[in-house]
Amino acid sequence: LRQDPALDGAQQERVADWLRAAAHQLISYEKPGALGNNHHYWRALAATSIGVLSNDNELFRFGVNTFKQAVGQEDSNGAFPLEMARHENAIHYQSFALQPLIMIAEFAERQNVDLYAYTDHGRTIRNAVTFLGHAIADPGIVKQYTSDEQKTNFSAGDVAELEFYFARFGAESAPNSLRNLLHNPATATRVGGNTTVLAGK
């Protein structure tokens, strides 16, 4: 939006105002005290990105707090319990939940808020990434959460957000299964398109 040469300053402000209003409406659907899952995280990513764009700290803080809530829900293995309840798609939903959370962390880093270092009961978002890698390598570890046979048809697009993670921590920071899965270029429309290019900027 800020780089679109077709929009002058007044038009950019008008669009930003509309996005801000839409984001506030979006998060108004949240029920106080409700437990978050990937739907909550995706709403939080929208709020975070628009909050940064429009200098709306309330929207930005909503995203930051949602990220912290997600880390707080990780179990001792790094799994998200609400996503583990997704039967044969448990591993896929662990992956799907990480997409918005990693992107929230990236937005926050650019606002000098280090969410990657945020710890709750001894765990960080990196534990969730590690669990995903282990589960992809050995779906049997999910049997403690669900008896359903796991779908394992993963592609680079399922973990495209990890381009940002690898750019920050190095590919060696994640299990081999994730490194082997993330072929370049990696693309996921939900997190901006070609993340290989975006993470390299």
Feature map (PLM): residue ranges:
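Aromatic-lined, polymer-binding surfaces characteristic
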Residues: 1-112
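CBM-like carbohydrate-recognition segments
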Residues: 115-201
